[in-house]
Amino acid sequence: MNNLLIGFLAITLLGTSVLAGRSPQSRDVPTPRAMVHKDNAEADNGAGPNSSVRVTEQKSVGEVPVLISRPGVVNRNTRLVVLYHGFGPPQNPRALAEALRLQEMNAILAFVNLPMVADRMPAGGRDELLRVQKEDFVNGFFFRSISGATAELQQIVKELNATYHLDADKGIGLFGFSAGGAAALLALLESDVPITAAVIVNAPMSVMQNVENWQRTLKHQFEWDNASRKAASRYDVELQADKIAERKILPALLIVQGDADKQLGIEPARRAFEALKQRYVGRGEAERIQFEVIHGLAHNFGPGSGATGSAQASIDLEIEQKTKHWFERFLCRGSS
């Protein structure tokens, strides 16, 4: 989920690169077609022969940078999907937009910049980021980022709903990768925003799981305090499955995990899924939850992940297709 640079030692934690003083768009990540400057817009015909013209816009919602990809014509059936990148490739909104092309959906795609990273690096840059990661990985960095994203979600949805004249009361879609997946899951646990469908890729299922990975990587014992224990009690999908299953709108939830993800492994995600599935079955909604293992998928994906070749391209396409099909099935049905 992030590369921690402690002193001169590079420590890889969940496969991520967090470097202050560096452009939030990696030189290895190509800019998506029709990427434009803040508050400007431009048509994008590049999605393929079956896609309608789309517009890409860079906006700020409050202080939150949001990259928008929307249909040229927004109608009453157009849905909103909020997408969160990870701390590593795809590690910012632009990289995620390049990795996950969903242009044929009748949906406004809002790629949101997570707190603490990319264009939202804290004052003090790399030194400050390293300090908070080292001194308090949970409330200084990881949980601070995902809980901040969850707290911002309602206002983001409200403003985009008003700007594009949407009907978000029917429910939105959420996508999250890695830390962004944790942010999306925390929203399912805590946010009042109506969420109809969600896709989670390679996400830690609890604060504890991420701390254990931090300890393995740094070979250092994390020092728990009351604040970090409280954070751990707020984010544990397996133990809090009832909260998701009791939502007024039961979210159609697809959990995707790579079998080559050495940082997270498969079992925590599988256990969380089984706990959730039991509740979904109890509500007679078993078809609204699914667990998919992608063979060969390591932690990161997309341009800039370091993986190359036809096998990786096939994996990236599989993530894109699973995401598209899930949203089309449960969010955008009959919306064209």
Predicted regions and their residues:
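N-terminal cap/lid segment of alpha/beta-hydrolase-fold proteins
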Residues: 27-76
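Alpha/beta-hydrolase active-site loop
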Residues: 130-164
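Primarily recognizes the serine-hydrolase "nucleophile elbow" in alpha/beta-hydrolase
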Residues: 155-216
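C-terminal catalytic histidine-bearing segment of alpha/beta-hydrolase fold enzymes
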Residues: 279-336
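Acidic beta-to-alpha connecting loop that harbors the catalytic carboxylate
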Residues: 87, 259-261, 297-298
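Conserved alpha/beta-hydrolase "nucleophile elbow" surrounding the catalytic nucleophile
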Residues: 85, 175-178, 258
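Short, surface-exposed "cap/lid" segments of acyl-processing enzymes
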Residues: 67-105, 111-124
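The feature captures the conserved acid-bearing segment of alpha/beta-hydrolase catalytic domains
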Residues: 208-284
